[in-house]
């Protein structure tokens, strides 16, 4: 592996360089030869090499043009990925679907500074993917997989758990990266749910979740006061107890609340 390129702090770059960890990630992602794989932010190709050995159809989406020559050089012995030098947030995943409409496996060591926007884009594309395996800051993964009645349970937990089965499958220490980040990392697995509770208005559901967690220490009654007043709704008629805080509600509770208020 060549490490000639200097990591750019502005892009949140930390290059993975531990071969054992890389092999473990690919193993956990269960990638087969026929899979269509898209790697987000391949950097210098440490993970890409193993993806090329596992699948016949690997695409990479890399925003930083300065790493692409090194990426190609590092992958030379393993194959050639389809390279898209662009921002993943503007990338059209459906352009990769083949004639049989085969769904895509997403994987990547996500830049920590834009991990949330990427996750929300993946939500929009959830009908096009088989699963996703992302390396993220461990604290973020813990928030995503948190259950109700915990301090780390929040907006991200509710929104992602509505769409996916979410699990933390591997913890990763800082020393396997170059340069070393100041935080621990973890692998998040997202698997789209086969069936979801029906929502009357998804955008309104997102808004209700956002408002409910706006001030964590306040009750639902206080956080949703303006919405209830606007709709002239008596809090006692709601399907949830508004004396509770948002962190006490399950994903299903938020669905019921949003549908009632829609």
From Swiss-Prot:
It holds the Pfam family RrnaAD. SMART domains: rADc. It is found in: Cytoplasm. It is an enzyme of class 2 (transferase). One of its GO terms (cellular component) is cytosol. S-adenosyl-L-methionine binds at residues 14, 16, 41, 62, 87, 109. It catalyses: adenosine(1518)/adenosine(1519) in 16S rRNA + 4 S-adenosyl-L-methionine = N(6)-dimethyladenosine(1518)/N(6)-dimethyladenosine(1519) in 16S rRNA + 4 S-adenosyl-L-homocysteine + 4 H(+). Gene3D superfamilies: Ribosomal RNA adenine dimethylase-like, domain 2, Vaccinia Virus protein VP39. GO terms for molecular function: 16S rRNA (adenine(1518)-N(6)/adenine(1519)-N(6))-dimethyltransferase activity; RNA binding. It comes from the Bacteria. PROSITE patterns: RRNA_A_DIMETH, SAM_RNA_A_N6_MT. Its main location: cytoplasm. Keywords: Cytoplasm, Methyltransferase, RNA-binding, rRNA processing, S-adenosyl-L-methionine, Transferase. Its EC number is 2.1.1.182. Belongs to the class I-like SAM-binding methyltransferase superfamily. rRNA adenine N(6)-methyltransferase family. RsmA subfamily. PANTHER family: DIMETHYLADENOSINE TRANSFERASE, DIMETHYLADENOSINE TRANSFERASE-RELATED. HAMAP family: 16SrRNA_methyltr_A. NCBIfam families: ksgA. Specifically dimethylates two adjacent adenosines (A1518 and A1519) in the loop of a conserved hairpin near the 3'-end of 16S rRNA in the 30S particle. May play a critical role in biogenesis of 30S subunits. This is Ribosomal RNA small subunit methyltransferase A.
